[in-house]
């Protein structure tokens, strides 16, 4: 390497990386610079030197891109929750198209150069879109603050006015910090592994109902806290306590108890309603979820004789879009509370052809096939880690005729397509901007078994 840590260098940014950073070359050394944009001439300082690349901190933009904008967020550079707010929104969508192309080029699934990559579907107003927050709590000089850890650290950045967060959820977390202070509730101490560590606030867009999870390493007395909070915000319908005594970075423990209110809140998507319990997964951008699920519906050509598997089904929200027009829908999820919601939702909507089971897809699907169930189509919506190897082998073994892959990580998507394109053709990839101002995107991939 020709560069050293703390060295200051000029750099021409040639392109943007998958995490939103600018990329340039200094005497043949690849340099990643967060905050820099394609086409810019910058001055930066090397912060880390690796075997094949270096990382740097942006010091000055000597020649700015015409697509650079001033972020409206006061903590944008320290928070780390958003990565590309300094890029004009239409160009953010172009960037997300390019991220998909970069991932495909890296992993090279069969026929990737001919894949149809459709332009990312963006938002008209890409602000205050997050209906869910998970903020950490810490004490600053005796005052409780809520926020996010700065990128790659355990240093909390207090946030009281997040520009991508739904305003009601932000107002509620602000009130929560005041009440935690007022009632002297214990705040998490990393050395003692004790106290309240995380607060989750989620709003259902359709009903304005709100649920809250207090994550604590020990039992806390919340009666007065709950009384004052629910009086100030009658939209709050559920307060739950999750016990997490782990030293790991996992947000939640295994046990969640409803302390006050109803078991679930009411949400709607694609003209049907469903219950959502506190631990159940649901997309955090309700407006774009309508768009995303609409694309899933378009991608599957199914009828009254077809059977569908909805892997990673959550509360059943994707599968319900098909339950009224197919022979059967079966789904599974590793979170038991989500499956309970899915079962209740199916019953309330009269879908007696929908069946849900708690467990891993790679374990349950082979069991169903041994029992004689045959799926004509499968929908997968895995976490950022992508498909489990065992599930990939299961899909390749049983070979449903159609498949829709909903991905929140283009790298693991491209990796999984290497295996899937052994028997499937990719018809197209349609990305949906679920997370404006971040480097993340969501993609719907239509696959058809090769004849």
Curated annotation (Swiss-Prot):
Active site (UniProt): 408 (nucleophile)
For this protein, what is the EC number?
2.1.1.-
| Residues that, per the record, bind [4Fe-4S] cluster | 73, 79, 82, 162
This protein's UniProt keywords: 4Fe-4S, Iron, Iron-sulfur, Metal-binding, Methyltransferase, S-adenosyl-L-methionine, Transferase
Where S-adenosyl-L-methionine is bound, by residue?
A: 283, 312, 333, 381
Q: Does 4Fe-4S show up as a keyword for this record?
A: yes
Q: Which GO terms describe its molecular function?
A: 4 iron, 4 sulfur cluster binding; metal ion binding; rRNA (uridine-C5-)-methyltransferase activity
User: Known InterPro entries for this protein?
Assistant: MeTrfase_TrmA_AS, MeTrfase_TrmA_CS, NA-bd_OB-fold, SAM-dependent_MTases_sf, TRAM_dom, U5_MeTrfase_fam
User: Which residue ranges does the record assign to the TRAM domain?
Assistant: 2-60
Q: What class of enzyme is it?
A: transferase
Could you tell me which CDD domains the record lists for this protein? Answer: AdoMet_MTases
Any single GO BP term: rRNA base methylation
What NCBIfam families would the database entry show? rumA
Family, according to the entry, reads as follows: Belongs to the class I-like SAM-binding methyltransferase superfamily. RNA M5U methyltransferase family.
* Protein name (Swiss-Prot/TrEMBL): Uncharacterized RNA methyltransferase M6_Spy1337
Native source organism of the sequence = Streptococcus pyogenes serotype M6 (strain ATCC BAA-946 / MGAS10394)
């Amino acid at each position: 390497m020709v560069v050293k840590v703390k060295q200051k260098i000029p750099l021409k940014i040639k392109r943007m990386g998958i995490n939103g950073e600018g990329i340039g070359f200094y005497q043949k050394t690849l340099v990643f610079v967060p905050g820099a944009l394609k086409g810019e001439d910058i001055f930066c300082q090397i912060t880390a030197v690796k075997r094949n690349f270096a990382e740097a901190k942006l010091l000055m933009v000597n020649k700015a891109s015409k697509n650079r904008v001033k972020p409206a967020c006061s903590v944008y550079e320290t928070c780390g929750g958003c990565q590309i707010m300094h890029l004009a929104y239409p160009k953010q969508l172009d960037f997300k198209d390019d991220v998909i192309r970069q991932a495909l080029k890296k992993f090279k699934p069969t026929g990737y150069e001919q894949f149809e990559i459709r332009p990312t579907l963006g938002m008209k107003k890409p602000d205050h879109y997050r209906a869910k927050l998970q903020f950490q709590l810490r004490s600053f000089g005796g005052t409780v603050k809520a926020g996010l850890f700065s990128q790659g650290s355990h240093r909390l950045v207090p946030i009281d006015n997040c520009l991508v967060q739904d305003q009601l959820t932000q107002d509620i977390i602000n009130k929560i910090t005041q009440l935690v202070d007022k009632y002297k509730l214990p705040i998490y101490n990393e050395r003692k592994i004790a106290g309240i560590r995380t607060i989750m606030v989620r709003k259902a867009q359709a009903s304005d109902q709100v649920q809250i999870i207090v994550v604590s390493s020990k039992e806390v007395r919340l009666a007065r806290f709950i009384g004052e909070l629910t009086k100030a915000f009658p939209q709050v319908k559920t307060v739950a306590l999750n016990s997490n005594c782990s030293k790991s970075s996992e947000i939640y423990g295994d046990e969640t108890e409803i302390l006050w209110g109803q078991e679930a809140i009411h949400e709607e998507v694609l003209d049907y309603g469903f219950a959502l319990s506190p631990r159940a997964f649901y997309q955090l951008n309700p407006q774009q979820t309508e768009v995303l699920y609409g694309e899933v519906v378009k991608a599957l050509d199914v009828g009254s004789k077809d059977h569908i598997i909805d892997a990673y089904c959550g509360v059943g929200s994707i599968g319900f879009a098909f339950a009224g027009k197919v022979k059967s829908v079966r789904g599974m999820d590793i979170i038991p509370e989500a499956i309970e919601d899915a079962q209740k939702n199916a019953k309330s909507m009269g879908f007696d052809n929908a069946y849900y089971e708690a467990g891993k897809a790679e374990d349950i699907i082979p069991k169903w096939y041994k029992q004689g169930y045959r799926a004509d189509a499968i929908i997968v919506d895995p976490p950022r880690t992508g498909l489990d190897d065992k599930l990939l082998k299961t899909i390749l073994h049983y070979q449903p005729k159609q498949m829709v892959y909903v991905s929140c990580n283009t790298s693991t998507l491209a990796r999984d397509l290497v295996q899937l394109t052994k028997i499937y053709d990719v018809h197209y990839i349609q990305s949906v901007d679920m997370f404006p101002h971040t480097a993340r995107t969501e993609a719907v991939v239509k696959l058809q078994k090769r004849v």
